[in-house]
Amino acid sequence: MAAKRNAVTTEAPESSAPGEGTALALDSRLSKRVESVIPKKRHEALKWFGWGYNDSQFYGKDGIICFRGEKYPLGGCELPSFTKWVEKKFDLRVDTTKQYPQLPRTYPRPVENAPFLHELKGTTQVDYSAEGIDRLVRCHGQTLNDIYSLWHHKFRRIPDLVVWPRCHDEVVQLVRLANKHNVMLVPFGGGTSVSGAITCPQNESRMICALDTSQMNRLLWLNRENLTVCFESGIVGQDLERVLRSEGLTVGHEPDSYEFSTLGGWVATRASGMKKNVYGNIEDLVVRVRMVTPSGTLERECSAPRVSCGPDFNHVILGSEGTLGVITEVVLKVRPLPSLRRYGSLAFPNFEQGVLFMREVARRRCQPASVRLMDNEQFMFGQALKPEKSWWASVVDAMKQRYVTSWKGIDLNQICAATLLFEGDLKDVQRQEALIYEIAEKFQGFPAGGQNGERGYILTFVIAYIRDFGLHQGIVAESFETSVPWDRCSLLCRSVKQRVVSECSKRSINYYTISCRVTQTYDAGACIYFYFGFRSTDVADPVELFEAIEHSARDEILSCGGSLSHHHGVGKIRSHWYRNAVTETGSSLYSAAKRHLDPKNIFALGNLLPLEEAQASPPPPTSSTPPKAKL
């Protein structure tokens, strides 16, 4: 089928915003589509072969690693310290001659379902495309495997068609047509998944249609009295916050993928943001959510802040990872913008003291908006990412280092750091700071400056670009995360790092890095991130090797009492462990919900349960088997 696009450009039908009348809207302009930073043709602004903007990238120049792009403070900087860190850690020189991959000349031939296409064109006003590049950029997320497969043109199965619904009603039409004609649907939001969740099943024989929600990004209504807002699910995080900031409000949900991920994706993966201490995780922010399934629309009929009305079906949708339907609209809590934002940082003599500090902060429930603890390896990595300094700045840094090592008696090979973000009014921030620094002192911590704290949070959005630069230079690297009770936190960090070291030794990997950080704190535990990478220049299949070691690390995490995931989700790459994580009974309950809501397996992504298990039919009923209960 030649690439085509529906020529209809009429305004989308108005959404039936759940439970709220138009009298509650701030004004009529709120129901207009938001002009997004990401265009409909994603590849015009974003890389087709990796993370982020086309004009933002690490690169080598005259043997020095640099960063280009005006969207980040690091743009235009040379990074000689980072260059030395890479050369020492991985024993390689920066190669400035290697080229980045080129777009493929041909694309997999699309599978066509003629009756579906006929009805799509004849009975709907939905825009669509079968162009190769539109299909390619929506065939993957951001796992190492995804990007490596793109670079080497390994994808055998990509969406056969891309559709852009503009509202809830058009999603209803599309799901009805797909169910009628047995077409597989892949809900696609920001494409930032790191769990393999949106990768097309490579053996799927049906027509695959990527349902891109990017044109569903309206703010439908805002209720200032209740401090609630309703957005369509396709709005990107930075667009959502920009719109709310213009009204003096914020949701406060800032995951590391905030620039590109969507509201619907946050709900589908049970996302967490760096400021959850103040605003909550996504499940704390969601008041109401609307999802279209092949069996109908699932939503709660009340916008009350809390109900006791049986199981909460919001939580059937939260974490469903695109396997049950398409999330179309979300009602969220909002808060007034804080009047003050202030950064800080702390240094501790070792990681164990830092963990004890984090535990005490959580115990006393005095967390600032964000507090993150880095181990020594990650601390040194962050220091290496500082741009080239002036002579005087170098002298000052040397004096600071002498103060830490000579006067404080701290070993630079053991030191770790915590970054801090405070939000509120002046009195709130001053109170938070005083208490945090008082607690830190009990664990031999001392202030390390607001500038270091600010740099740490700024680098959050730049670090994702390093993975692709590393791949370009012959280094495979990726992060993985978990959550764990406090009494096993330090043990898990040590054990997982030791397991990775052991696995590298078994495989004769001599040049690698493994580090961790504690990124979120709770009453009963914490979230831990691990960063692992190794030199792959002499490895036949580096991604397969990386995944084998990561698999071992995940086994170690689980054996130490950690979770399968804190916020990345299960997807395909962790589905192997899902049944054990939720028990046989829990897995069967999910499967029953899947069969009821999606009996033809239209959303056959293979997330959560492996694809063959998700497709399995229930046992045939017998005379003693009661009828299935409806959800």
Curated annotation (Swiss-Prot):
Enzyme Commission (EC) number: 2.5.1.26
Main location class: other
PROSITE patterns in the record: FAD_PCMH
Motif Microbody targeting signal positions after renumbering to this chain: 629-631
Residue segments, region Important for enzyme activity: 566-568
Residues the UniProt record annotates as site (Important for enzyme activity): 372
Binding site for FAD: 187-193, 256-262, 269-272, 321-327
Subcellular localization(s) per the UniProt record: Peroxisome
Residues annotated as binding substrate: 467
Active-site residues annotated for this sequence: 529 (proton donor/acceptor)
UniProt GO BP: ether lipid biosynthetic process; lipid biosynthetic process
GO cellular component: peroxisome
Domain FAD-binding PCMH-type: 155-337
Single Gene Ontology MF annotation: alkylglycerone-phosphate synthase activity
Pathway(s) annotated for this protein in UniProt: Glycerolipid metabolism; ether lipid biosynthesis
Keyword annotations from UniProtKB, A to Z: FAD, Flavoprotein, Lipid biosynthesis, Lipid metabolism, Peroxisome, Transferase
Presence of keyword Ion transport: no
Cofactor: FAD
Reaction catalyzed: a long chain fatty alcohol + a 1-acylglycerone 3-phosphate = a 1-O-alkylglycerone 3-phosphate + a long-chain fatty acid + H(+)
Span list, region Disordered: 1-22
UniProt record similarity statement: Belongs to the FAD-binding oxidoreductase/transferase type 4 family.
Subunit: Homodimer.
Role of this protein: Catalyzes the exchange of an acyl for a long-chain alkyl group and the formation of the ether bond in the biosynthesis of ether phospholipids.
Record protein name field: Alkylglycerone-phosphate synthase
Organism whose genome encodes this protein: Drosophila melanogaster
Organismal lineage: Eukaryota, Metazoa, Ecdysozoa, Arthropoda, Hexapoda
